[in-house]
Amino acid sequence: MILIRFLILEKEGAMKFEIKWKRAYEKIGEADGFRILVDKLWPRGLKKEDAKIDYWAKIIAPSKELRQNYHKGIIDFENFSEKYRKELEENSDFEEFEGIILEELKKGNVTMVYASKTPELSHIPVLKEFIEEKLGK
């Protein structure tokens, strides 16, 4: 599990909440807090009622064309990462997504949920880096 720590300031003092990254098939824990699915497709074989997803952020996942080109081997990971980063930069819905994250971090942890068996070779590292930059890690 990957963690990003944020300090959310409250009137009574500082509270520390985290953005976590977790595979959809991992055990759900109380510390997960608000769970956001960051994949375009629903995780195979996972029932919606078992996933405990609070928000499905299809809007920030790689486009269908980009995802398919990468999975078919038409483009390599480096090219995929560059193109996905560009999609994120041009995504007018990212601000809404960012707002949801910030609002939920005021209440507790946020867990980004994904299906990939190899997250290091998926869109996850690109999205993680982009979120860190936008939220000012």
Model regions and ranges:
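Residues lining hydrophobic/aromatic ligand-binding pockets adjacent to catalytic sites
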Residues: 9-137
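Accessible peptide chain termini
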Residues: 1-2, 15
